[in-house]
């Protein structure tokens, strides 16, 4: 398993999510909508044990993935980024076809399982896969 680069870890949660959504990071007209949905995704992740115990909220472009995850959960970074992106996309820019929406829902469920399992492996210290 590769270690995330410092640029990936220190990325702004808002700006990296906007980039994945295809929204120009310099445009702020959709920030409120994107932030609200990011915070919803982060609350879901917090309920499965990822992020600070007291919760975490994005208010703008300064909050980073490292702040949310801490240094103990960096092994789940890519899954967490993908989860937040898909969660926000599903609400902010949903697909028109129901089968595409179902695919996003299935991906969200799979990522929740992977993130939860990855978090448990870190807690147990079982990072070696056989």
Could you say what each language-model-derived stretch is?
Residues 1-130:
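Divalent metal-cofactor coordination and adjacent catalytic microenvironments
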């Amino acid at each position: 398993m590769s270690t995330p680069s410092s640029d990936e870890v220190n990325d702004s949660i808002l700006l990296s999510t906007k980039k994945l959504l295809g929204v120009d990071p310099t445009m702020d007209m959709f920030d409120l909508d994107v932030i609200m949905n990011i915070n919803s995704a982060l609350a879901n992740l917090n309920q499965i044990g990822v992020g600070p115990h007291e919760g975490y909220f994005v208010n703008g472009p300064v909050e980073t993935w490292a702040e949310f995850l801490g240094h103990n959960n960096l092994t789940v970074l890519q899954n967490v980024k993908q989860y937040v992106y898909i969660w926000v996309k599903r609400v902010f820019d949903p697909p028109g076809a129901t089968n595409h929406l179902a695919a996003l829902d299935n991906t969200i469920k799979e990522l929740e399982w992977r993130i939860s399992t990855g978090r448990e492996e870190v807690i147990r210290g079982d990072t070696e896969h056989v």
